[in-house]
């Protein structure tokens, strides 16, 4: 609410067959809603990369805000991105997780994952997909092949000077969180692969 900006939504459907409620409250700020259907679910990174490619090639925009549509990325935090983007129109912004909704054991494992990522790559990555990307950054991301396998790793690789804003992980609208220990391990390895040359040197 109360956003003096033109916002368009592009939904990338990752081949989901789950039924959704097609009522949309509080859409007075929304200029358009478009759904792009993927033929098969190829994972978060490829889904986001496909969305970025589609928007870059077919839309006019100043910023793109990739986010999960399951509630874990809270829509109310979009205003924080917009306010911060006014300060610098060329820098991209990341939502740094300050609070997670999973159990204690998973939170400990997640902190360990962040420590190992820093130890192996020399990069501190405290963000996920929920970001606000400038047009310049989107172009850089699409030129980086690793974007199709690791969004956060590739963003950290192509942009060293990122702004940040606190982000609280929300609760899913439907069902439990999909981030299992196995998925966390895959996430860690995908980031490591982005910086594999650095890892070998270290």
Predicted regions and their residues:
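Hydrophobic helical membrane-anchoring modules
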Residues: 26, 152-202
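A conserved acidic beta->alpha catalytic loop
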Residues: 13-21, 40, 71-72
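Short beta-strand/loop segment that forms part of the nucleotide-sugar
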Residues: 5-16, 36-38
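Short helix-capping segments at alpha-helix termini
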Residues: 2-4, 27-32
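Acceptor/aglycone-binding surface of glycosyltransferases and processive sugar-polymer synthases
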Residues: 39-40, 44-54, 63-66, 75-149, ...
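Extended hydrophobic secondary-structure segments that form protein cores and membrane-embedded regions
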Residues: 8-13, 63-69
């Amino acid at each position: 609410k109360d956003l003096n900006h033109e916002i368009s939504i592009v939904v990338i459907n990752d081949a989901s067959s789950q039924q959704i409620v097609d009522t949309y409250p509080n859409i007075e700020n929304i200029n358009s809603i478009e759904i792009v259907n993927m033929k098969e679910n190829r994972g978060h990174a490829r889904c986001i990369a496909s969305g970025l490619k589609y928007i870059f090639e077919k839309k006019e925009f100043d910023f793109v805000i990739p986010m999960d549509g399951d509630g874990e990325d809270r829509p109310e935090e979009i205003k924080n991105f917009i306010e911060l983007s006014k300060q610098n129109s060329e820098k991209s912004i990341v939502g740094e997780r300050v609070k997670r909704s999973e159990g204690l054991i998973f939170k400990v494992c997640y902190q360990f994952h962040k420590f190992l990522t820093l130890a192996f790559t020399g990069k501190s990555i405290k963000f996920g997909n929920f970001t606000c990307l400038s047009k310049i950054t989107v172009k850089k991301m699409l030129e980086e092949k690793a974007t199709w396998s690791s969004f956060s790793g590739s963003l950290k690789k192509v942009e060293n000077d990122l702004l940040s804003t606190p982000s609280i992980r929300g609760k899913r609208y439907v069902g439990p969180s999909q981030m299992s220990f196995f998925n966390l391990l895959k996430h860690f390895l995908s980031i490591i692969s982005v910086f594999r040359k650095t890892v070998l040197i270290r």
